[in-house]
């Protein structure tokens, strides 16, 4: 018959056997690998996207401390005096974007407005394309097409305009044999961008409202 101490040992033995063995410092589980930061992946994806028009304006605004005087020429080639618009002409600019763009004075005022929004390159590109389409000499066409590409299409240019990938691919193919219409699709896209994005703000701008008031005052004085 077991003595009381032996009986106590027999009762406690099974309970100790059911308990899991303790881990020593050598048997400790390896630390969990660090979690990847999901923001890194998102950041990479964002960087692969092209800047939209708002980001371009903000980027240029942060790098330009002041505006330089606007040259009197339209494409900075041959200086010409800026025409003075009539009151009727100024009012017609609000009727349609086409009327604004077909007016030399309208283009000049609108270009000045685009400069304040840091998107003047859109107008410069459109004007350069208009000059290219009027050129008949193939050697001149080749040179002008190259300059337009370097100034407004190349991703290395500070004056790069916002074009989608389809239009860019088309330009790259056409640049193998440039013609006067190499940039037609791109010109239409930039024209549409100015029409939808910048034109409504121009009509509400202080500059255009001042021209309207000036024209109204002029009409009243003549009456």
UniProtKB/Swiss-Prot annotation:
The modification Phosphoserine is found at residues 24, 103, 157. InterPro entries: RGS, RGS_sf, RGS_subdom1/3, RGS_subdomain_2. It is found in: Membrane. Residues 96-212 form the RGS domain. Pfam families: RGS. It is a lipid-anchor. Gene3D superfamilies: 1.10.196.10, Regulator of G-protein Signalling 4, domain 2. Fatty acylated. Heavily palmitoylated in the cysteine string motif. Phosphorylated, mainly on serine residues. GO terms for cellular component: membrane. Residues 1-30 are annotated as: Disordered. One of its GO terms (biological process) is negative regulation of signal transduction. Residues 20-29 have a biased composition (Low complexity). Keywords: Autophagy, Lipoprotein, Membrane, Palmitate, Phosphoprotein, Signal transduction inhibitor. It comes from the Eukaryota. Residues 213-223 are annotated as: Interaction with GIPC. Interacts with GIPC PDZ domain. Interacts with GNAO1. Inhibits signal transduction by increasing the GTPase activity of G protein alpha subunits thereby driving them into their inactive GDP-bound form. Binds to G-alpha subfamily 1 members, with the order G(i)a3 > G(i)a1 > G(o)a >> G(z)a/G(i)a2. Activity on G(z)-alpha is inhibited by phosphorylation and palmitoylation of the G-protein. This is Regulator of G-protein signaling 19. It comes from Bos taurus (Bovine). The gene is RGS19.
């Amino acid at each position: 018959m077991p003595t009381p101490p032996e009986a106590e040992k027999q009762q406690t033995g099974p309970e100790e056997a059911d308990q899991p063995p303790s881990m020593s410092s050598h048997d400790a589980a390896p630390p969990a690998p660090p979690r990847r930061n999901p923001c890194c992946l998102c950041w990479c994806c964002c960087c692969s996207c092209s800047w939209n028009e708002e980001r371009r304006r903000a980027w240029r605004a942060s790098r330009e401390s002041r505006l330089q005087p606007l040259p009197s020429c339209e494409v900075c080639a041959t200086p010409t005096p800026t025409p003075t618009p009539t009151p009727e002409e100024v009012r017609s600019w609000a009727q349609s974007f086409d009327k604004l763009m077909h007016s030399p004075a309208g283009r000049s005022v609108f270009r000045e407005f685009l400069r304040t929004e840091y998107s003047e390159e859109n107008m410069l590109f459109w004007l350069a394309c208009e000059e290219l389409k009027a050129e008949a000499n193939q050697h001149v066409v080749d040179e002008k097409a190259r300059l337009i590409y370097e100034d407004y299409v190349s991703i290395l240019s500070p004056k790069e305009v916002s074009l989608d990938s389809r239009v860019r691919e088309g330009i790259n193919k056409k640049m193998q044999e440039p013609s006067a219409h190499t940039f037609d699709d791109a010109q239409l896209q930039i024209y549409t961008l100015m029409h939808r994005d910048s034109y409504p703000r121009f009509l509400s701008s202080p500059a255009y409202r001042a021209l309207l008031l000036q024209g109204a005052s002029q009409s009243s004085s003549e009456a």
